[in-house]
Regions:
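Phosphate-group recognition and catalysis centered on beta-loop-alpha active-site segments
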Residues: 17-300
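Hydrophobic h-region of N-terminal signal peptides that target proteins for export
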Residues: 9-18
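Positively charged n-region of N-terminal signal peptides that target proteins for export
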Residues: 1-4
Length: 300
């Protein structure tokens, strides 16, 4: 009897553990529910200041320090295998030369990545499948340069069981998004990108808001000509969707960028959060942003 009871207790414990949501599930729910209690941090190209951009090591480091989303880029090999790399050519970030589309997957696997200073490292060029298996259960993944590959990447996401961890983005009009990708939008999160300085920004936004009903929007503006509309969107999206800003360079967020944050984090990150309603920020300085948010009790 004692052994039976012990066995039942262990089974119940294992069942409870298995049913607990993983961190990626929790983060996805924060976005879907419009949770504004914290600010989510996105590591651009997987935190390239620590390890080669778009590398497995960069993803692992991002997870270790508490990043919520890693942004990764996709390119396609000659034999239609998706690799995690930003440029269409190999020279800047790898030991290879030429266009990725001229190399087979097996040949790309022989290359080594370069670090931020352009020095060859021992890190290899990862496939999308390899990257998603590392991220699985730990962190959300924003796939950039990827909407052109939707039909190729979805089988990879299904195979790895990571489709619900992915945020896709693009700037096509709402009707086109629904026509091209509608079959996938119940799994991946689709995020419209909107440049507020462009003349058609309001028309595009109305389409996204009324037709797609997206749960997150990536907004950008280069100067104060668009600050009024940015503040208007803060009110319009309040309680309906989260706002994402990039602080990678000054023309993406009206000068409230990572470089400014080195000496004036309140004027950079604080402005985007408090004045423009940002609840997701993509950065090239993930640890700096995390420290700032934690000092304000805006991140665990």
């Amino acid at each position: 009897m004692k052994n039976i009871l012990l066995g039942c207790s262990m089974l119940l414990a294992m069942t409870a553990y298995a049913s607990e949501p993983n961190r990626a599930d929790v983060l996805r729910e924060k976005i879907l529910s419009g949770d504004t209690s914290e600010v989510l941090v996105v590591a651009h190209r997987g935190d390239w200041r620590y390890a080669p951009e778009n590398s497995i090591a960069a993803i692992e480091h991002s997870i270790a320090i508490g990043v919520d989303i890693v942004e990764l880029d996709l390119q396609l090999s000659k034999d239609s295998v998706l690799f995690v790399i930003h440029d269409s050519k190999l020279e800047r970030t790898t030991s290879g030369k030429g266009r990725i589309s001229d190399w087979t997957a097996d040949s790309l696997r022989t290359l080594k990545l370069k670090n931020g200073a352009g020095i060859r490292t021992m890190h290899s060029l990862p496939t999308l499948e390899e990257a998603m298996l590392v991220a699985k259960g730990h962190v959300l993944v924003n796939l950039d340069k990827a909407d052109r590959y939707f039909d190729l990447l979805m089988p990879v996401l299904e195979k790895t069981g990571t489709a619900t961890q992915v945020i896709m983005k693009g700037n096509k009009p709402a009707a086109q998004v629904d026509s091209l990708y509608g079959a996938y939008l119940d799994k991946v999160i689709y995020m419209p990108k909107l440049n507020l300085n462009k003349p058609d920004a309001r028309e595009l936004m109305d389409g996204y808001f009324n037709e797609l009903k997206s749960v997150v929007y990536e907004l950008s503006y280069s100067n104060d000509d668009a600050i009024g509309y940015a503040m208007e969107l803060k009110s319009r999206l309040d309680g309906k969707a989260l706002i994402w800003y990039n602080t990678l360079w000054d023309t993406q967020s009206g000068g409230h960028d990572d470089d400014r944050a080195l000496n004036d984090p309140d004027g950079a990150y604080g402005f985007l959060i408090d004045t423009l309603g940002a609840r997701i920020i993509q950065t090239d300085r993930a640890e700096l942003l995390l420290d700032y948010l934690r000092s304000r009790s805006l991140h665990k």
